[in-house]
């Protein structure tokens, strides 16, 4: 139930971004903020951002002409939750993500959040992760 609610909220948020981008010519730039956290508490279990929760809104916005930058608290390569890369979690968006060399290169060198100027962006989006 939580997952359905989360995706419903995510879809509504993305829809608002899209509607605003279509209706407001100046809305063209969104900052995606993903985690730098790579371990789940003191369990030693690897974690990071969830690929589908990043990829679905990323491509929805990108395909509407929105420019997207990516930042993390520490800058650099954000960790991906290994469970999100399981074949059972694959979707069209995650397959596109895996094949997107331009995006994968961008993710290797994300901006450090402290260095981001908020006035450069029309919106900020936080994909899921720990």
Regions found by a protein language model. Give the residues of each.
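Bacterial Sec-dependent N-terminal signal peptides
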Residues: 1-25
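Extended, subdomain-level signal for the structured scaffold at the beginning of enzyme domains
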Residues: 22-130
């Amino acid at each position: 139930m939580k997952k359905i609610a989360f995706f419903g909220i995510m879809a509504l948020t993305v829809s608002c971004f899209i509607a605003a981008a279509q209706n407001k010519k100046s809305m063209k730039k969104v900052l995606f903020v993903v985690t730098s956290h790579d371990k789940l508490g003191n369990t030693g279990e690897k974690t990071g951002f969830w690929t589908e929760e990043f990829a679905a809104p990323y491509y929805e916005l990108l395909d509407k002409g929105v420019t997207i930058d990516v930042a993390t608290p520490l800058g650099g390569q954000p960790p991906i939750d290994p469970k999100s890369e399981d074949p059972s979690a694959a979707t069209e968006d995650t397959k596109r993500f895996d094949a997107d060399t331009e995006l994968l290169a961008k993710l290797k060198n994300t901006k450090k959040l402290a260095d981001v100027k908020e006035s450069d962006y029309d919106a900020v989006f936080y994909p899921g992760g720990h």
